[in-house]
């Protein structure tokens, strides 16, 4: 077991069980005695033992859905998934629980909060200053992913608010389609291209993606459907969405961005303010699977934990 090769300590415990009346899927629960949240560990073991499900055909995804049946309209991920043994070992040492499911190359890490998407194992393969820069860049890009297009739409609806040094962001060409419809159509079109790329044979994925991007981008602007500025900002948002490791968090940001766009279009400044408040409340009132704040250490505030989350510190040693 690759985790055992990194943590050769008797306190590193692995408990095996099964779930699924038909599949009898093997499940391993890994944790570190003395560091794990005992209440959470007890809850997880009880839920797995009492789980009544026909089969876990989708492996850890099926198990995650059974362990935490949150409301369908809540897109925020409660688990992290990783295929890296170093990430799993580090998470165990931090007091987290690792769940391994048979036939799956990845592990489940819990509990998980919004700030876990900011951290990546690669940060610790660089010097502290570089790791801190990458972490802060990841956070900044994630915020831009959420607010860039709604804020730009707000400024386009109120051009008198644009300072002289930002006049270049205004649309130079004539608009044939309202901006809000351009942005919403592109939101769905990008997902359509992504789905097409997934289902395209691997040897054709790269050339077809390049051709589709160039042809659709060029002729959609020339035909008057979209303005070049709209294409630019949506292209940035699409690429920036991959700056954080969690695929589920990327879609959560996308859903909040669409809500912000619609509210800003309908109610102008008050829509933007209300949408921002709604997004903040949606994150702030979320709970992890352990029942703690989803945005800890901001709420409740802890300066020492904030420093650990935002800055890549040196490895403690003597």
Locate predicted features.
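Short glycine/serine/threonine/alanine-rich loop segments
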Residues: 97, 225, 269
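Transmembrane alpha-helical segments that form the functional core of multipass membrane systems
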Residues: 106, 112-260
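Hydrophobic alpha-helical transmembrane segments of membrane transport and translocation systems
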Residues: 228-230, 234-318
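Short polybasic/polar patches that bind polyanions
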Residues: 8, 49, 194, 221, ...
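Cytosolic regulatory modules rich in charged/polar residues
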Residues: 1-179, 289-317
